[in-house]
Amino acid sequence: MKTLTILRHAKSGWDVQVERDFDRPINKRGARGADLIGQWLKRQKLPVDRIIASPAVRVTETLDIFQPAADLDTIEPHWDRRIYLASAATLIDVIRDTGRDAGHLLISGHNPGLEDLILMLVPESDDDELRGEVEEKLPTSALARLEIDIDDWHDLDVNMARFAAFIRPRDLDPTLAPAMDHD
């Protein structure tokens, strides 16, 4: 069995003027969310043995905060440009390229691709509350952990996963609940 942890980048600063969307940094609220989610992962003692991530600034800054908080700072992320603004289908290809040796993979990137990836991997069910929450919104710094009954990431396909966990920054600190979280 494999586990896939999906981490959306932290809240970014729309007020910062940058030439390219790729260069947009996270803001203070985003930094707090990334730290809280990292601490939560550490408390849960959920292992991660490989990280693949978008090289966009808001993802690298998220991981700069999340990894030490989660006690994962010894893992060097593999930066993959295909993850930047990728579709769910592209994200599945990226994950399949991981091979068999990583048992607990973490992918960090962007919406709508990550949200669509979760909804593609976890089958629809009337009684799956976590899937319903993701259908509503995968907010910034949210983390979903999926369990998948495969031995090799190359075998990953749709409707194969089940939720092990889903956590948002506002679940850990209600002051981080947004009126409208558009990024």
Briefly describe each language-model feature range.
Residues 11, 56, 112, 150, ...:
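Short, glycine/serine-rich, charged loops/turns that create anion-binding
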Residues 55, 74-90, 134-140:
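A short, structured active-site edge motif that brings together acidic residues
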